[in-house]
Swiss-Prot record:
Residues 75-86 have a biased composition (Basic and acidic residues). The gene is hfq. One of its GO terms (biological process) is regulation of translation, ncRNA-mediated. Keywords: RNA-binding, Stress response. The lineage of its organism: Bacteria, Pseudomonadati, Pseudomonadota, Gammaproteobacteria, Pseudomonadales. This is RNA-binding protein Hfq.
């Protein structure tokens, strides 16, 4: 995987494992709510009363309902990606 996934995947995985409720805002302004059931390189499965497959290219923002703590990087690959990538 490319370096762009070094933050995205652990973040989504933490939200999934902890079943954190999220609001997902799409690029067209629509707000979806639920919890992340699964995800891959291209899509996120969002579970609420139904499961929705949301394509990542349509997602603008993912907002967790509560603060989420990411696991600390153990391999050092995350260390240089934080300061200048805004």
């Amino acid at each position: 995987m490319s370096k762009g996934h070094s933050l995205q995947d652990p973040y989504l995985n933490t939200l999934r494992k902890e079943k954190v409720p999220v609001s997902i805002y799409l690029v067209n302004g629509i707000k979806l709510q639920g919890s992340i059931e699964s995800f891959d390189q291209f899509v996120v499965l969002l579970k609420n009363t139904v499961s929705q497959m949301v394509y990542k290219h349509a997602i603008s923002t993912v907002v967790p309902a509560r603060p989420v703590r990411l696991p600390s990087p153990t391999d050092g690959e995350h260390g240089d990606s934080e300061p200048g990538n805004a």
